[in-house]
Amino acid sequence: MDITFTIFAQSLAFAALIWIVATKIWPPLIKVIEERQQKIAEGLAAADLGQKELAQAQEEIKKTLKNAHKKANEIIEQAHARAHQIIEAAKAEAIAETNRQQNLAQVEIEAAAKRAREELRKHVSILAVNGAEKLLKREIDVNTHKMLLDELAAEI
């Protein structure tokens, strides 16, 4: 065999190999590679989208927490204000009740004093009448008069 025939046969075999690879093997390989590239690209896009959504969610969480904190502070302030109002109302009610009780006590004291004065007047008038009776029953002389007045003073 001739060297040219061998080179020609090898060239023909190589061309047949190239044709078989190019028509039968290469297209499915390219298709698999392209599908893999597409999946990788989709995965990267999904990862980017996930990162963006995560950042948005974190921002939204921060806003929500800030609003919740603000609302909590407002509620606490309202509770303090309401407690202050309740305390002030209780103080005012206690002062009013104290004043009312003082007025009632003052009225009772005045009534008791009035009763005591009336009782004292009655007692003094009875003593005066009794003293006058004693004076009128006896003859009036200086010693008797003085003695009766001393008795009345002792009774008073």
UniProtKB/Swiss-Prot annotation:
GO terms for molecular function: proton-transporting ATP synthase activity, rotational mechanism; proton-transporting ATPase activity, rotational mechanism. It comes from the Bacteria. It holds the Pfam family ATP-synt_B. CDD domains: ATP-synt_Fo_b (cd06503). Keywords: ATP synthesis, Cell inner membrane, Cell membrane, CF(0), Hydrogen ion transport, Ion transport, Membrane, Transmembrane, Transmembrane helix, Transport. One of its GO terms (cellular component) is plasma membrane. InterPro entries: ATP_synth_B-like_membr_sf, ATP_synth_b/b'su_bac/chlpt, ATP_synth_F0_bsu_bac, ATP_synthase_B_chain. It is found in: Cell inner membrane. Belongs to the ATPase B chain family. F-type ATPases have 2 components, F(1) - the catalytic core - and F(0) - the membrane proton channel. F(1) has five subunits: alpha(3), beta(3), gamma(1), delta(1), epsilon(1). F(0) has three main subunits: a(1), b(2) and c(10-14). The alpha and beta chains form an alternating ring which encloses part of the gamma chain. F(1) is attached to F(0) by a central stalk formed by the gamma and epsilon chains, while a peripheral stalk is formed by the delta and b chains. PANTHER family: ATP SYNTHASE SUBUNIT B, ATP SYNTHASE SUBUNIT B', CHLOROPLASTIC. F(1)F(0) ATP synthase produces ATP from ADP in the presence of a proton or sodium gradient. F-type ATPases consist of two structural domains, F(1) containing the extramembraneous catalytic core and F(0) containing the membrane proton channel, linked together by a central stalk and a peripheral stalk. During catalysis, ATP synthesis in the catalytic domain of F(1) is coupled via a rotary mechanism of the central stalk subunits to proton translocation. Component of the F(0) channel, it forms part of the peripheral stalk, linking F(1) to F(0). This is ATP synthase subunit b.
